[in-house]
């Protein structure tokens, strides 16, 4: 397959830099049952259970971005809202819960010196939502958050999370087979959003003449 060929030829990348290849596997075409593929690529298989990255982690780039926690919270809110069709009030509630979780973690959006504090995870946001008796439950926001919490999609302990760039060493497969379409869509959207943010922070890859590092 193309993936296997890329994996085998990565030594020819500029500076011999290893490739990180991420596969969203909707049908189970690349999971543990496909031993030939796994053995040929030494692939890491992840399930949508305690995924080891934090969608609320703050990714700082060389170009300063004011109010980074607010932008990060808003991006997560937007992604969840699109997948679950949340209304304006529900979006505002979710955004406030995320911002409250940042505050409890010692992160102040207006103070960049606090941005290196450990970012809250989805589980911490969910606990704030679930324990706030003033928030009206029983709507689509509750259904969305309850489902993500019930399936334990994201790692709850921030100390056990890594950046996507750290995780993407070699071939990494997120096995989405057997999960509902909404969970599949959310995981893909959040992962790509996070990957884009980290790519921006990392900057352009190295050029060697007419060749760019992959």
Feature locations, PLM:
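P-loop NTPase motor domains
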Residues: 2-214
């Amino acid at each position: 397959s193309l993936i296997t060929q890329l994996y085998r030829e990565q030594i020819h990348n500029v500076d011999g830099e290893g490739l990180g290849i991420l596969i969203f596997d909707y049908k189970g075409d690349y999971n543990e049952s496909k031993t030939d593929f796994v053995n040929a690529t030494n692939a890491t298989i992840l399930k949508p259970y305690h995924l080891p990255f934090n969608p609320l982690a703050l990714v700082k780039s060389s170009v300063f971005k004011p109010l980074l926690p607010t932008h990060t919270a808003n991006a997560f809110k937007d992604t969840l809202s699109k997948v679950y069709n949340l209304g304006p009030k529900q979006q505002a509630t979710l955004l406030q819960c995320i911002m409250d979780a940042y505050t409890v973690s010692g992160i102040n959006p207006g103070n960049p010196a606090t941005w290196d504090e450990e970012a809250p995870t989805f589980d911490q946001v969910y606990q704030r939502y679930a324990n706030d008796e003033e928030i009206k439950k029983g709507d689509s926001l509750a259904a969305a958050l309850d489902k993500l919490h019930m399936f334990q999609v994201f790692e709850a302990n921030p100390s056990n999370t890594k950046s996507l760039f750290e995780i993407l060493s070699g071939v990494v497969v997120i096995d989405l087979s057997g999960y509902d379409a909404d969970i599949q869509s959310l995981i893909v959207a959040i992962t790509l959003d996070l990957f884009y943010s980290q790519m921006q922070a990392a900057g352009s890859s190295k050029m060697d003449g007419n060749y760019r590092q992959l």
